[in-house]
Amino acid sequence: MMRLLLLPLFLFTLSMACMGQTFQYSRGWTNGKRALTPPSLLSHGHFNRASDLGFSDLYDVQDWSSERRLERCLAQLQRSLLSRVYGSVVDFNANRPEPDSSDSGSSRNRANNNNENVLYPTPIQNRHHSSNELLEEISAAVAGSGPTGAGSGEPSVFGKH
């Protein structure tokens, strides 16, 4: 008879301990340390008994206000970046290669060109090459097909940067 009473009591106690640990962990009260009280709400005399408060509600309010501030800051940053990018559209379009160039690899360069995705337009066109393009340019320069001639041991690619 005693076993029938102790087993449900033990299971209930174990489940309540697990729920309590989960509650404390979700509120940041790990290792017996409670999270710090928010000084802005408690120092102005709005709440007199800090032990009776539901601190999770206070932290939700505090997180919400900081999230709103963060959203406003990110929106301002995004607007400034967009105005910087769209303000220099003339310079940005001047750096693009001409579509009617007679280069044999121009279609490959246009397909791998990252100018459409760049946030900050740069006047240096060679920064947006992929690693395969750079490898091909270096191997072509070493083979002697570069503008420096076949006899030169120095590739012309490194002088551009």
From Swiss-Prot:
GO molecular function annotation: corazonin receptor binding; neuropeptide hormone activity
Keywords: Amidation, Cleavage on pair of basic residues, Neuropeptide, Pyrrolidone carboxylic acid, Secreted, Signal
Modified residues (Pyrrolidone carboxylic acid): 21
Gene Ontology CC annotation, any one: extracellular region
UniProt GO BP: neuropeptide signaling pathway; positive regulation of heart contraction
Prodomain residues: 70-161
InterPro entries: Procorazonin (IPR020190)
Pfam family of the protein (one): Corazonin
Regions of compositional bias (Low complexity) in chain numbering: 102-117
Residues modified as Asparagine amide: 31
Signal peptide coordinates: 1-20
Region called Disordered, residue ranges: 93-125, 142-161
Family the UniProt entry places it in: Belongs to the corazonin family.
Function, in words: Cardioactive peptide. Corazonin is probably involved in the physiological regulation of the heart beat. Clock (Clk) and cycle (cyc) proteins negatively regulate Crz transcription in a cell-specific manner.
Protein name per the record: Pro-corazonin
Organism whose genome encodes this protein: Drosophila pseudoobscura pseudoobscura
UniProt lineage: Eukaryota, Metazoa, Ecdysozoa, Arthropoda, Hexapoda
Gene giving rise to this polypeptide: Crz
